[in-house]
Amino acid sequence: KSRTSKVDKTERLNRVTYCYYFLVVLVSIFSYTLGYGYFLALAANMFSYFIFDQALRLMFNYEKNKSRPFINDASKKLNSNAIPVIGITGSYSKTTTKNVLAKILDESNNVFVTPESYNNRLGIAKAINEGFNDDHELAIIEMGTYSNGEIREICSWVRPHVSVITGIAPVHLERMKSLENILDAKSEIVELAGSVVINGDDEMLLNEARLWTNQKNVYDCSIT
């Protein structure tokens, strides 16, 4: 039997909802003022998904700027002790790779690990602000993305020294459109790193990694 998770009504969701209602009212007022009667108002209700999408677009920069101090606090906290940072991304097995690596490294280090699948900009910042402390000697950060530029933005303040890419696969194609876009988005994690570890069984990733060898230490792990 399928189940639908309960949606938490966060302040952010409330703000977007209020913006949506404002746009619907605005369309209704314009419709009546311009002599269309209730035609555009009815159309606004029929295409409410489109108006909600516009509300999300309008609120994007506001929400990003509002969260900037939160991100800055996380960056300052993580980078204050100049500890090694490992960033992990890929189309699959990010969390598993992170947990296995953390288990190995925790034998001789006090390791900070982003919990569960906290792998977006705000989730990573929340994990660092709430869980990272001066006793940690190493950090492992999982990074996910739905579009180009997201991982680059995360890396600009997480600053990974070592980057891991688990593999490239046709995941989230409804947003990413192509495997090439997925590869480009995931590859953003290597830009600031000195060393890169990749899945050596992924031919597409191997070909891309050849472009990094002059500037990075590149290691491929393979079971074949």
PLM regions and their residue ranges:
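Short catalytic-loop micro-motif centered on adjacent basic/acidic residues
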Residues: 87, 112-114, 138-142, 196-198
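Short, basic phosphate-binding NTP loop
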Residues: 1-86
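Inter-motif core of Ras-like GTPase G domains
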Residues: 151-170
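AAA+/P-loop NTPase substrate/partner-engagement loops
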Residues: 117-131
